[in-house]
């Protein structure tokens, strides 16, 4: 029960941070830049309103994998020991997993280890997001098509899976070039530019996250019951 509560709190905290960005952006562009800087690694000083919204959606989508779905999977497979091993790898990646001059040597290992841990969960997350889109009135079919087409449109082998599902479900385009530590990193776009993102898309993304997490919890519980009966 404590572990399930921990997962719920992780999703809740992520949703609260994303909602904080939405509210800050309603106040001013500068407030939005400052607030989104709490949840993204990219430089935020010159972000436009659109870029702030996209950055927030991308962050929720990416962290849905490594902050919610992956821990659920590893806790189910190996209990607290495997769950905490994953958490340690994820934390190390967040701290030093940058492929720049400063962190190149140790950062490479941290980033690659995190890629391995999240390889399977990222794909599970994308599929569950496509399914979760339907009861929310989002476009699950387009989400699936976008995942099939754009799942490789990222420097990471995992990030674009959940981001493409989010882009397709919401009908917005994510990705593109970002600036990290003063250096521009060129990234492909994800999804179709059907319409510009709006503040309400952050709320839609949060709801998509919670329903996806619920589906994963049901899946894990179902598998556990089957194993127990065997």
Residue ranges and their predicted role:
Residues 94:
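Solvent-exposed interhelical
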Residues 1-85, 89, 97-230:
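Hydrophobic alpha-helical transmembrane segments
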């Amino acid at each position: 029960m404590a572990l399930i509560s921990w997962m719920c709190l992780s999703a809740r905290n992520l949703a609260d941070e994303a909602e904080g960005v939405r509210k800050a952006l309603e106040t001013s562009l500068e407030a939005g830049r400052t607030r989104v800087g709490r949840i993204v690694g990219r430089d935020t000083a010159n972000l436009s309103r659109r870029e702030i919204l996209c950055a927030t959606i991308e962050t929720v989508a990416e962290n849905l994998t490594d902050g919610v779905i992956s821990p659920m999977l590893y806790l189910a497979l190996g209990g607290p020991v495997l769950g905490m091993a994953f958490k340690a790898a994820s934390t190390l990646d967040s701290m030093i997993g940058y492929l720049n001059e400063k962190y190149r040597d140790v950062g490479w290992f941290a980033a690659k280890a995190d890629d391995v841990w999240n390889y399977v969960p990222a794909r599970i997350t994308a599929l569950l997001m496509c399914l979760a889109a339907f009861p929310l009135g989002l476009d699950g079919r387009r989400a699936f098509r976008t995942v099939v087409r754009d799942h490789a449109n990222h420097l990471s082998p995992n990030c674009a899976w959940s981001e493409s599902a989010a882009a397709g479900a919401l009908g917005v385009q994510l990705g593109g070039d970002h600036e990290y530590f003063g250096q521009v990193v060129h990234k492909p776009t994800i999804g179709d530019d059907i319409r510009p993102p709006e503040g309400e898309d952050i709320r839609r993304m949060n709801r998509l996250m919670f329903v996806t997490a619920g589906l994963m919890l049901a899946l894990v519980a179902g598998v556990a019951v089957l194993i127990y009966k065997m």
